[in-house]
């Protein structure tokens, strides 16, 4: 060294002194996340929190023994800067001196080792692509990479030495030295560490890395932040409250159990490094590699123990390691070294190489060919040497190595290893597949242990090998990732023969050749179990890209032999490394996602592995099938399919579902790889093939998951599997959310930087919607990307989207138009779906779907993570977040649907769900041709769906046919209904996810375009989608009781995003957790909450018209595509994502993104808001959602029906498939709608819900795009309905003709019933459209009666729906109601059919009478002016009402809108649009107009729906007209409030008026609340009563009543609405008041829109109130106005407050002056509590219990200042004079401005009010009496009188006046 030892020592002493100063007194290490106490002592945050958590009582400062509390802790940013600078100094010191700085004083050793290693490694790394790395670093980190490297290296070394060396140097200084030397390189990592927490760091972290990493994270806030999220993501279990906490924990754990923490560290590091750590990673991975070999062994040992502590992981890993060691001892040893290198180097190197790869991804392969060969030879030698050393090392070392490897790679490998452990004969196969993981792990472990044995040799071999391996690996892995991700199995196959082949293959990966796939397929065929296992492992690993590649390679290697394995293992590790690098490089979050997935896999590994092992062969087949499909050789795919059992395939589906996230990760990684390789931009086809590959991989991945799932075929195992799966998915989602959050950030940056553009496109291919939003922020490109992924041709997509739009107008046209580009794919998909040969293509498409879904979900998670931590992201971000959340929740929802179906109708619903989901996925993926695919698919898919083997494809195919097929298949497959249904549910789950995600994608995709058009409109909808999805995710997850654990974890996972929704979700969870019935309830609830889930799951459920569903979705997709309007998309998403409503609250209020808490706080609220918001944000969306909601309820009914009779649904579905074909004639159907009313109505009713949702979307489309879309879609919907209801048409017609008799049938066939009823209602609607309001009302009445009997259940459900919709706001209650209804659906429906049916019938009769009266009134109020439209609305509303109070409302609104669109809109689009526009344009007017619409739609629900529709349409129109986000937000807010208030309230009201009749005023209140514009006033009341109603049979009855009322009202009211909203509203109000004279003041209050102000609250409390207001759609203003209804005061426990201006004005105005506790308690109870109990009783001045506010509120007719003339004279403080004057005016006084203006005369008493202390002149106010004869009093007289609301005597307030001496 140039520096003398003395100088170095001096510097070191200075640094040591500085370090001691900056040491935490508790942990004696550099402070991480410094926090200062009140006594100004600095500690690590984690240490302090640990200290505080240890003691129950007050904790004492360790230094001064003063009491400390968590609140007293304050972050010390300056101190953290000092620590960071110290770390930089240390890094610089290390770089300058070549010494590792730690506690160690072994600088000589370190110097010697480090220079050599640094030289070797640096040279090698440089040769491999160090420049690229630098470029990468420069790209990702604009900072000077060298400096960062240096400083970070020093930091890392320091950190490593500081912590690692302290702990581990003591253990093994040499290792530490090695590590440190490497660590100096890894200083780079440190730099990247914050960004990267790079592999080196990881390894540092793994060795001592946690601490180091933590310090490193301390090093930079970025690191800390990234690491924090990553740690959070990875170490969900470690729950990183702060980096320091986690880091400290991890550091200590790393020391104790480095592996565990290292695993998280690795993930964290991987995520963070993202592309930053290229240089550092290269240096560091070498260093860390060496360290890993030695230190890692220790760390791994500790980590192994730690892992042991990790229950499932520890065991599975331990077993794995043991087994893997035994099985793959020799193989592993080489592989381990590679892996260690890969882990140490690889993570860094992967990143480096990926980075290198990105720039040089294509060239490096050529250059890497030689290195790869060299690497292979060196690997062989090293492997041999390691094998020998491994034997010497023994199990401990090997375990250590294994532990570490496992920590990193084993996360994935654990699962695979578990599979290995659990498989016997298939264990070999599994070992080939899983064992490669194990081999990777074991090999890495062995490498570590061997490295521990001989660090020098390890260093030499490892360094050289790593460098070579890393470099080839990187490019090779890139190939592998690209090809390997797509063609991982072929790669594995090819990898055996030649790495060069792989490289070559990899280059063509972008344009994957059939040969590759065929080879892969052949390999799969040859060693199907092996390959499948490999594929499975690969899939999972692919999820964790490096692992997938590695496992694939390892699998190949194992398959080839140990010798081959040596190369393959290196290849694997390299591939893994490369994959990791690619992933890390493009997206460190991706790595983190992978790692998280790995961790998730690890945590879930035991169960999954067992399952996988058990069904590894079959899974392998499924995997192979998937792979083949994705790969492209249809023949091979077919063979594979044939080889796979249908149940296996189903399992595969299930698995595919599960791995969707992994797939997403893979796809993200693939996207990144394309970004890296820059292949995507150049080769859309390549991308498409890649996407297919990705699809294959996702499927493989899915297959892996299904493999595991399949293995746990037993129900318990399934549950276990499902639970692990869900937790795993949840974790993945959660982690991915966090990671993806990082990724989301990174994607934006990367995408912006162009790195991600490829990735984005690729991601878009797979799941790029989020990424696309990030990149495009809602631009066509994003749509293009989305559709690219959908269609697989990014470049063509924008046009495709357009063509899709056009095509959507004409579904067939869309099919053909969109099919231009898509059709090749679409038809390939569609027909392949239809045909087995094409099945592979379809599979690839479905894989695309799943890939899209997976990546979309991944991106979604990224976005969602981002959403959570960056709620105010730009619109694109918001949309991204929304989409992400949508996708995320979509995933959960998919899980939920499977859960739901597991609970309720696992077999049929799940299958159908799958089918629905898949088609939707296809639709979404196809994004336009999905319509084609789905339309044709149902029939074609029927063919495939018949084939269990095709099941994966079939799921999409099943949409129409899956009901029939799935029912048999399900029954056949469901012979183990619990086992397979979970598989199906999983599949459904995944499919739902995909579908939802795809819909979301489309939504997002289209949302982006509209976003451009509409500004934030899309984003809000996306946000709302996200929110709702979250809610729905949770609800769905919670919904499945068998999957309750799964649900629990999902909920937990979603909980992070949904915790805010958590309150109601928790209720749901609680309910779900309590009983399975509640589970179903939750499911149904979720159906309500998540109509989309239901639609998706229940489209399967509603298998009657899954085709309609499909069409609905297609329409939705079409509509969305056609419109590209966020509303339509919202509708699509919302429809697919019932959660959309809640989301829409968010959507409507991006604040809800911020206020996820709001949504979370009040899921019911969020849901209500969401539904209402959905209505608000996009009226059509909400309508669509409402109609979807109804549809889900219809589906719920169908679900019941499924339970009762799935066959009927099957026939329904068959009808649907045929219907799909007829869909193209929708316009004809539309025109012939009235003619076809009976059959159409039935179908329409079935489709009504779907179609209505579609129609809502369509209406939005028609509003947005044109009436044509609406008509087409209406026609489509109607056609679907007709087709769909064709069978039911008879019933519907019968119902129509003999509603009562059909009622029984409907009752018997609730599932059919609901659609029929819906159909009938729609028929009636149509008929009433044609015939008129009267007929509509009569039919509605009869239909209502029908409903009363047949729909009684449905009505109860509808009531549930209504209440759910209303209670969607109520959330828990709604959920409870829904769950009650749901659980009661099967059992209660029977009860309902008996007891409640009679009650409902009676109520319906009463309702009919009431409706007749209402009709008369409404007709008087102008339903006549626009008879056709009103009748249309009335009919649709009435029919919809009949169908479902809310459902019918939604549908009514939709149909009304549709009909408005079709008729009025088509005829007079301006009228409807104007109406809607008025509603939306007048957000404020919207209240009135909404009421008007309400009124116009006499049925509040219909009117609300109309209103909603109008609102959403007007929102669309308005947004179209006023795309500005502000307007949208205004509309959303106003509409949200008004719609939710009047809308939901209207819905509740109309439907609730009867309910109120039944149940009394509370409902009436809510009804009135609905009636009233003031949703804020009683949304909670609404919801609560609604829930009560839902829970109560009377509520069902009332619901039935409501529909009639609604129908009658809607029949007349729509005309009124169109004619005069005011007249309609008045008529409605009059009729309502007549009907419900019992409406209380509270109801009246609810009728008024609630508006509140707050006084005396802290910002936190204000935010809580704000959330509360948002949830309950209360207007929250800063100033009190005449519209203000509530003044929220900060009070003490006795409701005593300080006197403020708002307090006085509130009392003077007779407002509700309530305590802040009203808000808090309402939030706690998830409903708006009665204000009476929280009214302010007094104030600190006038008395603590003077009851002034109550007196004022109840005495507004007796004004205290009546007859007084008051002149407020002179200056006043604390209160403007005009406010004081307004106050006295409010109290009945007349204000006089001037003293000379007093009126002289009898009966008027003038008073002059002054504030003496405000006068600057001492006696100025004493002379007032000279100017007038009035008494002069102080202002206190006014204030006291107002506060007490009693006119006080003037005597005590009089100011003595100077006598008039001049007289």
Curated annotation (Swiss-Prot):
Record annotation: effect of changing residue 810 to Y: In BC; benign; functionally neutral in vitro
Impact noted for substituting residue 1187 to I: In BC and BROVCA1
Biological process terms in GO annotation: cellular response to indole-3-methanol; cellular response to ionizing radiation; cellular response to tumor necrosis factor; centrosome cycle; chordate embryonic development; chromatin remodeling; chromosome segregation; DNA damage response
Documented effect of changing residue 346 to S: In BC; benign
Outcome of swapping residue 1770 to V: In BC; pathogenic; functionally impaired in vitro
Outcome of substituting residue 1101 to N: In BC; benign; functionally neutral in vitro
Effect caused by changing residue 1670 to E: Impairs formation of a heterotetramer with ABRAXAS1
Region (Disordered): 230-270, 306-338, 534-570, 654-709, 1181-1216, 1322-1387, 1440-1505, 1565-1596
Resulting phenotype, residue 1139 to I: In BC; benign
GO molecular function, one term: damaged DNA binding
Effect noted on mutating residue 170 to W: In BC; benign; functionally neutral in vitro
Effect of residue 26 to A: Disrupts the interaction with E2 enzymes, thereby abolishing the E3 ubiquitin-protein ligase activity
Reported effect, residue 1330 to A: No effect on in vitro phosphorylation by ATR
Consequence when changing residue 1706 to A: In BC; benign
The entry's keywords: Acetylation, Activator, Cell cycle, Chromosome, Cytoplasm, Disease variant, DNA damage, DNA recombination, DNA repair, DNA-binding, Fanconi anemia, Fatty acid biosynthesis, Fatty acid metabolism, Isopeptide bond, Lipid biosynthesis, Lipid metabolism, Metal-binding, Nucleus, Phosphoprotein, Repeat, Transcription, Transcription regulation, Transferase, Tumor suppressor, Ubl conjugation, Ubl conjugation pathway, Zinc, Zinc-finger
SMART domains assigned to the protein according to its UniProt record, in alphabetical order: BRCT, RING
Residues annotated with Phosphoserine modification: 114, 395, 398, 423, 434, 551, 694, 708, 725, 753, 840, 988, 1009, 1143, 1189, 1191, 1211, 1217-1218, 1280, 1328, 1336, 1342, 1387, 1423, 1457, 1524, 1542
Phenotypic consequence of residue 1775 to R: In BC; pathogenic; alters protein stability and abolishes ACACA and BRIP1 binding
The name this protein goes by in its record: Breast cancer type 1 susceptibility protein
UniProt organism field: Homo sapiens (Human)
Name of encoding gene: BRCA1
């Amino acid at each position: 060294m140039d520096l003398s030892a003395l100088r170095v020592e001096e510097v070191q002493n200075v640094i040591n002194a500085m370090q001691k100063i900056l040491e935490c007194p508790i942990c004696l290490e550099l402070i991480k996340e410094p926090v200062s106490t009140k006594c100004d002592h600095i500690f690590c945050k984690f240490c302090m929190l640990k200290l505080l958590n240890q003691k129950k009582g007050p904790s004492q400062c360790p230094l001064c023994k003063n009491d400390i509390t968590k609140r007293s802790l304050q972050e010390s940013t300056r101190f953290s800067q000092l620590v960071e600078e110290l770390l930089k100094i240390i890094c610089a010191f290390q770089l300058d001196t070549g010494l590792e700085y730690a506690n160690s004083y072994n600088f000589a050793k370190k110097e010697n080792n480090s220079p050599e290693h640094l030289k070797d490694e640096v040279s090698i790394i440089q040769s491999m692509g160090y420049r690229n790395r630098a470029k990468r670093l420069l790209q990702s980190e604009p900072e000077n990479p060298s400096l960062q490297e240096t400083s970070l290296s020093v930091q890392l070394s320091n950190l490593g030495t500081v912590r690692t060396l302290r702990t581990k140097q003591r253990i093994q200084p040499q290792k530490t030295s090695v590590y440190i030397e490497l660590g100096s390189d890894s200083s780079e990592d440190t730099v990247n560490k914050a960004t990267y927490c790079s592999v080196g760091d990881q390894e540092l972290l793994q060795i001592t890395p946690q601490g180091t990493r933590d310090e490193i994270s301390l090093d930079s806030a970025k690191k800390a932040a990234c690491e924090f999220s990553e740690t959070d993501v990875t170490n969900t279990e470690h729950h990183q409250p702060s980096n320091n906490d986690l880091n400290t924990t991890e550091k200590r754990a790393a020391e104790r159990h480095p592996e565990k923490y290292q695993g998280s560290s690795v993930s964290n590091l991987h995520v963070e490094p993202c592309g930053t750590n290229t240089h550092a990673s290269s240096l560091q991975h070498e260093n860390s590699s060496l360290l890993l070999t030695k230190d890692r062994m220790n760390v791994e040992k500790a980590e192994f123990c730690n892992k042991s502590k990790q229950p499932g992981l520890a065991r599975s890993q331990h077993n794995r390691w043991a087994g893997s060691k035994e099985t793959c001892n020799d193989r592993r040893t080489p592989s381990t070294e590679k892996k260690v290198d890969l882990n140490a180097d690889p993570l860094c190197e992967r990143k480096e190489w990926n980075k290198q790869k990105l720039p040089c991804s294509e060239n490096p392969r050529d250059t890497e060919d030689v290195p790869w060969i060299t690497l292979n030879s060196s690997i062989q030698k090293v492997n041999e040497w390691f094998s020998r050393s491994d034997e010497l090392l023994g199990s401990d070392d090997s375990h250590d190595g294994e532990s570490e490897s496992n920590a990193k790679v084993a996360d994935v490998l654990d699962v695979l290893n578990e599979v290995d452990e659990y498989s016997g004969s298939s264990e070999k196969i599994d070992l080939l597949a899983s064992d490669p993981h194990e081999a990777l792990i074991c090999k890495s472990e062995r490498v570590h242990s061997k490295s521990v044995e001989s660090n020098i040799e390890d260093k030499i071999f490892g360094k050289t090998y790593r460098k070579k391996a890393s470099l080839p690996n990187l490019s090779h892995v890139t190939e592998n990732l690209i090809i390997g991700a797509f063609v991982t199995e072929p790669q594995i196959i090819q990898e055996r023969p030649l790495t060069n082949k792989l490289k070559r293959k990899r280059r063509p990966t972008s344009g994957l050749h059939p040969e590759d796939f065929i080879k892969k397929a052949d390999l799969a065929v040859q060693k199907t179990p092996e390959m499948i296992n490999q594929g499975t492992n690969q899939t999972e690993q692919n999820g964790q890209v490096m692992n997938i590649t590695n496992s694939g390679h390892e699998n190949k290697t194992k398959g080839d032999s140990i010798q081959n394995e040596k190369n393959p293992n290196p290849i694997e590790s390299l591939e893994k490394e490369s994959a990791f690098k690619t992933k890390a490089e493009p997206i460190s979050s991706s790595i983190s996602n992978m790692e998280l997935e790995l961790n998730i896999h690890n945590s879930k590994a035991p169960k999954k592995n067992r399952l996988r092992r058990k069904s590894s062969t079959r899974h392998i087949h499924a995997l192979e099938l998937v792979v083949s499909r994705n790969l492209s050789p249809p023949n091979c795919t077919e063979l594979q399919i044939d080889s796979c059992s249908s149940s296996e395939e189903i399992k595969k589906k299930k698995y595919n579902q599960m791995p969707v996230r992994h797939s997403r990760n893979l796809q993200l990684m693939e996207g990144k790889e394309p970004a890296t390789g820059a292949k995507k931009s150049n080769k859309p086809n390549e991308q498409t093939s890649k996407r297919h590959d990705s699809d294959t991989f996702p499927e493989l991945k899915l297959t892996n998951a299904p493999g595991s799932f399949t293995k746990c075929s037993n129900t318990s195992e399934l549950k276990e599997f499902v639970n692990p799966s869900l937790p795993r998915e949840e974790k993945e989602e959660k982690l991915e959310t966090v990671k993806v959050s990082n990724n989301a950030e990174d994607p934006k940056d990367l995408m912006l930087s162009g790195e991600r553009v490829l990735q984005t496109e690729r991601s878009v291919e797979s799941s790029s919607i989020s990424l696309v939003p990030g990149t495009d922020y809602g631009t066509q490109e994003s749509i293009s990307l989305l559709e690219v992924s959908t269609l697989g041709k990014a470049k063509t997509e924008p046009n495709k989207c357009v063509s899709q739009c056009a095509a959507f107008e004409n579904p067939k046209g869309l099919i053909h138009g969109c099919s231009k580009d898509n059709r090749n794919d679409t038809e390939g998909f569609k027909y392949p779906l239809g045909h087995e040969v094409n099945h592979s293509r379809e599979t690839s498409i479905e894989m695309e779907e799943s890939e899209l879904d997976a990546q979309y979900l991944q991106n979604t998670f990224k976005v969602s993570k981002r959403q959570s931590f960056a709620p105010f992201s730009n619109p694109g971000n918001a949309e991204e977040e929304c989409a992400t959340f949508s996708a995320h929740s979509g995933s959960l929802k998919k899980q939920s649907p499977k859960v739901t179906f597991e609970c309720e109708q696992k077999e049929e619903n799940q299958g159908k769900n799958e089918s629905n989901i898949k088609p939707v996925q296809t639709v979404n993926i196809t994004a336009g041709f999905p319509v084609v695919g789905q339309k044709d698919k149902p029939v074609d898919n029927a063919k495939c769906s018949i084939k269990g083997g095709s099941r994966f494809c079939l799921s999409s195919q099943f949409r129409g046919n899956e009901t029939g097929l799935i029912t048999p298949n399900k029954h056949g497959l469901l012979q183990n209904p619990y086992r397979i249904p979970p598989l199906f549910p999983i599949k459904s789950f995944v499919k739902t996810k995909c579908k939802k995600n795809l819909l979301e994608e489309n939504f997002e995709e289209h949302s982006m375009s509209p976003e451009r058009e509409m500004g934030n409109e899309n984003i809000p909808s996306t946000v709302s989608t996200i929110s709702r999805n979250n809610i729905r995710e949770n609800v769905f997850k919670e919904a499945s009781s068998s999957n309750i654990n799964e649900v629990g974890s999902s909920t937990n996972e979603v909980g992070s995003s949904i915790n805010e929704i958590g309150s109601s979700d928790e209720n749901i969870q609680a309910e779900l957790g309590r009983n399975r019935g509640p589970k179903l309830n939750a499911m149904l609830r979720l159906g309500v909450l998540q109509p989309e889930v239901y639609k998706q799951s229940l489209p399967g459920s509603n298998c009657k018209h899954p085709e309609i569903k499909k069409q609905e979705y297609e329409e939705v997709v079409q509509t969305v595509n056609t419109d590209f309007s966020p509303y339509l998309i919202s509708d699509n998403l919302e429809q697919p994502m019932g959660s959309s409503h809640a989301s829409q609250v968010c959507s409507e209020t991006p604040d809800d993104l911020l206020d996820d808490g709001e949504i979370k706080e009040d899921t019911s609220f969020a849901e209500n808001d969401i539904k209402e918001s959905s209505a608000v944000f996009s009226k059509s969306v909400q309508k669509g959602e409402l109609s979807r909601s109804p549809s889900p309820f219809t589906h719920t009914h169908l679900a019941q029906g499924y339970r009762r009779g799935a066959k009927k649904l099957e026939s329904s579905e068959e009808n649907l498939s045929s219907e799909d074909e007829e869909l193209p004639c929708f316009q004809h159907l539309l025109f012939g709608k009235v003619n076809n009313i009976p059959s159409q109505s039935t179908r329409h009713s079935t489709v009504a819900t779907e179609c209505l949702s579609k129609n809502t979307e369509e209406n939005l489309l028609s509003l947005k795009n044109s009436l044509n879309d609406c008509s087409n879609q209406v026609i489509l919907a109607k056609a679907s309905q007709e087709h769909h209801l064709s069978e039911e048409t008879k019933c519907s017609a019968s119902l129509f003709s003999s509603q009562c008799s059909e009622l029984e049938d409907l009752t018997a066939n609730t599932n059919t019933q609901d659609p029929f009823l819906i159909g009938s209602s729609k028929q009636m609607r149509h008929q009433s459209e044609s015939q008129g309001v009267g007929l509509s009302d009569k039919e509605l009445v009869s239909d209502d009666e029908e409903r009363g009997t047949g729909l009684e259940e449905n009505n109860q459900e509808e009531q549930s729906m209504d209440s759910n919709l209303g209670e969607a706001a109520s959330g828990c209650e709604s959920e409870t109601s829904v769950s009650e209804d749901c659980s009661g659906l099967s059992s209660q429906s029977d009860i309902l059919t008996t007891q409640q049916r009679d009650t409902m019938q009676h109520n319906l009769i009463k309702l009919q009478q009431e409706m007749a009266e209402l009709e008369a009134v409404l007709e008087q109020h102008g339903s006549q002016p626009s008879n056709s439209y009103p009748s249309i609305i009335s009919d649709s509303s009435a029919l919809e009402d009949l169908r479902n109070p809310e459902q019918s409302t939604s549908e009514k609104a939709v149909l009304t809108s549709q009909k408005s669109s079709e008729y009025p809109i088509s005829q007079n689009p301006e009228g409807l649009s104007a109406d809607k526009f008025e509603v939306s344009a007048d957000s404020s007017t919207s209240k009135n107009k909404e009421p008007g619409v309400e009124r116009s739609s006499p049925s509040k629900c219909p009117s609300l729906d109309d209103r909603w529709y109008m609102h959403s349409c007007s929102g669309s129109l308005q947004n179209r007209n006023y795309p500005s986000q502000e307007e949208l937000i205004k509309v959303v807010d106003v509409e949200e409030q008004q719609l939710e208030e009047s809308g939901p309230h209207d819905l509740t009201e109309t439907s609730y008026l009867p309910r109120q009749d039944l149940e009394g005023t509370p409902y009436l209140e809510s009804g009135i609340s609905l009636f009233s514009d003031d949703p804020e006033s009683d949304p909670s009341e609404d919801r609560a009563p609604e829930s009560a109603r839902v829970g109560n049979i009377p509520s069902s009855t009332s619901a039935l009543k409501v529909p009639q009322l609604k129908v009658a009202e809607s029949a007349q009211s729509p005309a009124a609405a169109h004619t005069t909203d005011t007249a309609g509203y008045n008529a409605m109000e009059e009729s309502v008041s007549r009907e419900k004279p019992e409406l209380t003041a509270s109801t009246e209050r609810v009728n008024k829109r609630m508006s509140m102000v707050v006084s005396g609250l802290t910002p936190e409390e204000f935010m809580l109130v704000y959330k509360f207001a948002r949830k309950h759609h209360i207007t929250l203003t800063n100033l009190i106005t005449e519209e203000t209804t509530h003044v929220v005061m900060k009070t003490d426990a006795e409701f005593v407050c300080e006197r403020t201006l708002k307090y006085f004005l509130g009392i003077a105005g007779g407002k509700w002056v309530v305590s802040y506790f009203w808000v808090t308690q309402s939030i706690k109870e998830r409903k708006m509590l009665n204000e009476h109990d929280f009214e302010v009783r007094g104030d600190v001045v006038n008395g603590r219990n003077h009851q002034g506010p109550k007196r004022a509120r109840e005495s507004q007719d007796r004004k205290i200042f009546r007859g007084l003339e008051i002149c407020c004279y002179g200056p006043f403080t604390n209160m403007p004079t005009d406010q004081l004057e307004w106050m006295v005016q409010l109290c009945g006084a007349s204000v006089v401005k001037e003293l000379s203006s007093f009126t002289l005369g009898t009966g008027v008493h003038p008073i002059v009010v002054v504030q003496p202390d405000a006068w600057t002149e001492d006696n100025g106010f004493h002379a007032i009496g000279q100017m007038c004869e009035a008494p002069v009093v102080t202002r206190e007289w006014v204030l006291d009188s107002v506060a007490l609301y009693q006119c006080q005597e003037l005597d005590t307030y009089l100011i003595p006046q100077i006598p008039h001496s001049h007289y």
